[in-house]
Amino acid sequence: MAKSPALQNTQISDRANQRNAVAAGFLGWTLDAFDFFVLTFVLVPVAREFHVSLVEMAATITASLAMRPVGAFFFGLLADRYGRRWPLMLDIVFFSIVEVLSGLAPNYKVFFVLRLLYGIGMGGEWGVGASLAMESVSPKWRGILSGLLQEGYAFGNLLAAVVYSLVFPHWGWRAMFFVGGLPALLSLFIFAKVKETEAWHESRTDWSTYGKAIARHWKLFLYMVLLMTTMNSISHGTQDLYPTLLQRQRHFSPETTAMITMISMVGAIAGGLLFGLYSDRRGRRRAMVTAVTFALLLIPAWVLSSTVLLIIPAAFLMQFMVQGAWGVIPVHLNELSPGELRGFFPGFAYQLGVLFASSITLIEAVLARHLTYAQSLGLLAGLVLLIGVPVIGLGPEAKGVAFGKAERGRQ
C-alpha cells in the first residue's frame, strides 16, 4: 500500500530533524572543543603580553577544567526541566561571548576569571548536546552517530590548529579568541531547524519527583562517575604527555611531533565511528572492552618504537582504539540514564570524571623524573587500561532501550 502524502511528509520532516539534531550536537561539541584548544596554541604569546609565567597560564586551563562540573550540573538541570534546545542555545551563546571577552582581557586577572566562566560553558555543552542528539535518532543508528558526536572533540582540536596557522601569524592571539565567538551562530541554527525531543516531553517531571529520581538512581550515577573517571584517565594518560615523549626522549622536531599527533587524531576519528557502529551490532560494553583490550596490547609498540615509520602506525592505532572506546560513551551513558535525568546524569558524570582523572598527567610527569617517559606512560596507561576492562565489562548496559514513555519505571 502506498504511503499517504501526509505520512511521507512527516517521515521526511522527522529524518531532517534527526540530521539537524545530530549536526547541532556534533557542531556544538566541535566548536566548544575548538574554543578550548585555541588557548593551548597561544599560551606563550598571552603569557608574554600579560607578563606571567607559563605555569600561571597553565593554571587558566586547570581553572576551566575545574569549572566544567559546575556547568554540567547547572545546564543539565535546566535541560531536564525546560527541554534540551533552549539550555543548549543559552550555553553556546554564553561560552561564545566569554571567548570573545577573553580576547579583550586587559590583564591576567580578568583573563583568569573569564577562563573560569568559560569552563562553566564548556561543561554544560556535552551533556545537553548528547541527550538532544541521542533522543532524536533511531535506536539502530545511535552507536555510529555517538561515535561521530564524540569525535567532534578531535575535530575541534584540528580546527584550532588550522585557524592558528591562518589567523595568528597575521592578527595575533586576540584575533584567535574573536574567531571563537562564531559558534554563537549555531544557536540560530538550533532555534530554526531543531525540534524539542519527544522523549523529553514524555519524561519531564516536577522538581519534587525529579529529586526523588536522583535519589533512587544514586548507585547508577556513582557507577557512571567511576566509568568516566576511568575513561578520562585512559584518554589523558595516552594523549597529554605523548608529544613530550616524542620530543624529549625520541628527539623529534615540533613539526614531526605535530604531524604524528594529527595522524593519531585521524585514527581517533576513524576509531570513534567504527567502534560506534560495532556497538550497534555487538553491544556497547563488548565494543568498548574490545577497543580497550587492543589498546592494552599496543602499549609496547606505542612507547618503545623509536623511528617515525614505527611510531606513526603505533600512535594511529592507539588513538583508534582509545577513542574507539570513547565513541561509544555518548550513547552508552544516555541509554543507561533514566529519561527524566538524561540531561543531567551523562554530562555531570562525564565532567566529574574529567575532574577526578585530572591528576593522571601530573602523575606521569612526576614518574618520568625517576623513569623514562616511555616507562612512565607505559606503566600508567597500562594500569588504567587494565582497570578499564572490568569497570566496563562488569557494568550495566541498556543497548537499544526505548526513550520516552516506554522507559518509565525503568530502574
Where on the chain are the PLM-derived regions?
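Conserved MFS/SLC helix-loop-helix module at the cytosolic interface between two early adjacent transmembrane helices
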Residues: 70-106, 282-285
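Helix-breaking motifs and short loop linkers at transmembrane-helix boundaries and internal kinks
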Residues: 51, 83, 104-110, 138, ...
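Cytosolic juxtamembrane N-terminal segment immediately preceding the first transmembrane helix
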Residues: 1-34
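Central cavity-lining transmembrane alpha-helices of secondary-active solute carriers
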Residues: 62-75, 262-274
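Cytoplasmic helix-loop-helix junction between adjacent transmembrane helices
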Residues: 114-151
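Helix-loop-helix hairpin linking two adjacent transmembrane segments in secondary transporters
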Residues: 149-191
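Extracytoplasmic gate region of multi-pass secondary transporters
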Residues: 40, 219-269
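C-terminal transmembrane helical hairpin of 12-TM major facilitator-type secondary transporters
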Residues: 279-329
